[in-house]
Curated annotation (Swiss-Prot):
GO molecular function per UniProt: ATP binding; ATP hydrolysis activity; nucleic acid binding; RNA helicase activity; U1 snRNP binding; U2 snRNP binding
Motif (Q motif): 418-446
Listed result of changing residue 469 to A: Decreased ATP binding. Decreased ATP hydrolysis activity. Loss of function in pre-spliceosome/complex A assembly
Pfam families: DEAD, Helicase_C, KH_12
UniProt key word Hydrolase: yes
Source species of the chain: Schizosaccharomyces pombe (strain 972 / ATCC 24843) (Fission yeast)
Reaction(s) catalysed by this chain's protein: ATP + H2O = ADP + phosphate + H(+)
Compartment(s) of residence: Nucleus
Impact upon substituting residue 575 to A: No effect on ATP binding. Loss of ATP hydrolysis activity. Loss of function in pre-spliceosome/complex A assembly
UniProt: ATP binding residues: 462-469
Name this polypeptide is given: Pre-mRNA-processing ATP-dependent RNA helicase prp11
Helicase C-terminal domain segment(s): 638-802
Amino acid sequence: MSRRTRSRSPPRRSYNRERRDYRKYDDSEDQKGARYNRYVDDVSSRRDRHDSFRSHESNKIRRDNSWKHDKYSYEKRYQERDREYARSKNIPDQYIGRSPRPTSHRHAEEKEVDNKTKSDETNPVLQGSATEIKPQPRRSRFDRTERVGASLSVSEIQSENPRVDVIPKDKAVENNHQRNAEKPVASDKITDAKLLARLERVRAWKESKAKQEASKKEEHKLNTKPQVTAKDQNAMPSTGISGFEINRQKDTSDMKRNNRVHMDDEDGPRRMNLEDYQELWDQEDRGMLGNEQAASMEEDEVDPLDAYMASLVGTTDTIRPGLLNTEVIDPNANDDERMVISETLEEEENLLALAAKRSKKKDVITVDHSKINYEDFKKDFYVEPEELKNLSPAEVDELRASLDGIKIRGIDCPKPVTSWSQCGLSAQTISVINSLGYEKPTSIQAQAIPAITSGRDVIGVAKTGSGKTIAFLLPMFRHIKDQRPLKTGEGPIAIIMTPTRELAVQIFRECKPFLKLLNIRACCAYGGAPIKDQIADLKRGAEIVVCTPGRMIDVLSANAGRVTNLHRCTYLVLDEADRMFDLGFEPQVMRIINNIRPDRQTVLFSATFPRAMEALARKVLKKPVEITVGGRSVVASEVEQIVEVRPEESKFSRLLELLGELYNNQLDVRTLVFVDRQESADALLSDLMKRGYTSNSIHGGKDQHDRDSTISDYKAGVFDVLIATSVVARGLDVKSLQLVVNYDCPNHMEDYVHRVGRTGRAGHTGVAVTFITPEQEKYAVDIAKALKMSKQPVPKELQTLASQFLEKVKAGKEKAAGGGFGGKGLSRLDETRNAERKMQRKAYGEDEEDVETEAEAKSPLEKITPEKSTGDPTLDRVRAAVGGIAARAFANQTAQSNKLTQPISIIKTDGDEYKAKMEINDYPQQARWAVTNNTNIVHVTELTGTSITTKGNFYLPGKNPEPGEEKLYLWIEGPSELVVNRAITELRRLLLEGINHSLEGGNKPSASGRYTVV
């Protein structure tokens, strides 16, 4: 029972009315007697009990205050009782009055007075003596000194302090022998040879360490550098762990051990020497000598610590786990040896870092097609109908002209069909087509389906909403059904890659009506959705995979490539291929394509296909047939295009006017508003909601789940107005969408065509309104061109803006706007990288040094001799281009290596301090970040023991600092030239990593809205 619980017992219990001592009694009978006496004497009235209770409460409060300082205080009357009890039990006088627990320092004087009074009254030897006796201090169970017993003399007891004898070792051993002689079983001599050998090793080891201690201390004094204080208030100290000086005069027991760097007095790291524990062991030995039992243990039993440490002599030193990352260097090694070891360790760390980086990088396992025996497959299924065989070339040209002017590039292209029955489709496919309401093939379908079914690689270019998806889906179903079913562990037969997630979902939904009847399984793999569900679908088996390039790379590289593979893939579709390459997916697309068998069938479709994309497309195609319907980048004739030139302030009011006119006349219609930026989409959404229009926004900054649900609600009619960026400019198909508003003018013609093409699909009509401000005159040229190509009237205001801009371009006052997606892909990547490298070389001042290397990189490509030629001109051009890229990469790498290897001067100050200045202003942003972020700075300072400070200001290339200012640089300070050089080497390594990362990933698309693969 606790103290507080006992003190608050009810007052009706008679034995708790009076104040009593709450210490623990040793005799239970004494407790019972005291309780009985108090119970018999308690015959007071109720009032007395009440007064007693009040007294009890006041005493309790006073007692609680006393317990705050001394938990076990005594009163005079209870001490007298203890003395009587001690006499009855024959307890020695010296223990009378001693508390079984230590008292507080605050009441030490009171305890001494109580003990003196008790001793004077009870000890007959000390009665009448004027000498005060102080109580014996409480000894810990860990004390090895001899306790003073009752047999001590009076003079010893009367001494000022209690005596603690320290018996010499030889005397202790002698006394131990005498005591052991009285024991019949004890032995006077150790006969265990193993124990004697251990004792001998311990003595020899202690003697050798004692001899080395003096020489080591003197050597340490010589090597210790004088302490230098920082003169600048903002400057960091130059020595110590992490750049801070450690006051080694203080006790270092409270210092936290660093798990990475061993806190040592020397500049460089050293081994953990056993002599560091010598002082601790000597103190332990001195404590053992003061105890007789310790003296006997010296001969009978070896201390476990000494025996264990002695067994380690001659073995390899073990480094603590916390020091695994620390360099282990001999403390007696000179500076040259330390530098060699340091460079070796740095090289190993670089290799480990590179290996870790490569292990984290997701990459598809490269497939050697020459070592794989692929199954044969058939891709020519087309049988020309009898009614088409008899058509003459003139009649075929007339038929193609009637189908929106189909243009063909390539040889042996099949004739276009006029009905579904001529396509050679199965009965199940025809039934699904009829249920969907497709009466006859569209222009692109009439020509593309026979071409793809005959096994040709096809490039299909057609206007938006012309049915391009069905044009490659129907031949794909026929292609899949001709092959054997999938086995466990086999990958898909057909892959459809798209640039956006919304387009992938759209194509997957168009596949669904055919899958059940044809007994085909499909999987949609795109970013933002849980990858575990997609992996589960692939493991169950899927003949069709609709995917985005990034997620397909994740799936192929997951679990070391054991999730799925591309060995069975024979049909590849690249939908909106120009946009895929423009978004920077060219490396991912090529990695996927290179892992598909070379004799595959490849199909490319898009509404816009610039000429500059042809060379890129032909890398993945073999003798393709190009089918163009209605021209390149042409808006469908079903769309009414309206272009208005108006200031920025009037656009919102005009938008409200258009929405009011539309919804006053029609109810179940949809409106799509395009803006340029995500912030503009959210701001416009807020404004429309305030005006009472049910609307929502979609852009790349939203989660994929939100984007999918937004499109589903938009198609279902939950809201009528959708505000979006160009993320839905391709693939979005909503039948009731009748109004498209380009709130922000598109910056090139291809984007304009795709935005406007969201309406007027599948034969329906629609309206597209575009707002353009007078400041956006450079975009007026492309919009006017699109109107002319689609045979729409061009407004006078728009034509005036276009003419004014063209005049400025001719006069050299303006630069022509970009031509959309043309010239992008690999060409854009190479040009951008070359421009960045030129800027970096110019900033580094390396133009003159790298003239020869740059000339070699720009030299004409090596001619492919007939012996080296592969027979394929496309492959030969690719090999030559790869050689040129390798030469440019080598030139850039050489230039940066020359810059980083330039020496940096180290200055020695008067206070034996070494300083160095390392400029970082002209390096790329990622390289500057690598050497200025706190994590790397702390790592370098802990590794080298230097102080690194970032000083100066950053200036853009071509700008000079103001008078009295300096460009951005690192100020390195250290106690020796060795540590400063090591810091410079480590910083150069970080700079090189940052430069390489900047060159490799500088042109990758932003990761906003991307998924995270766990």
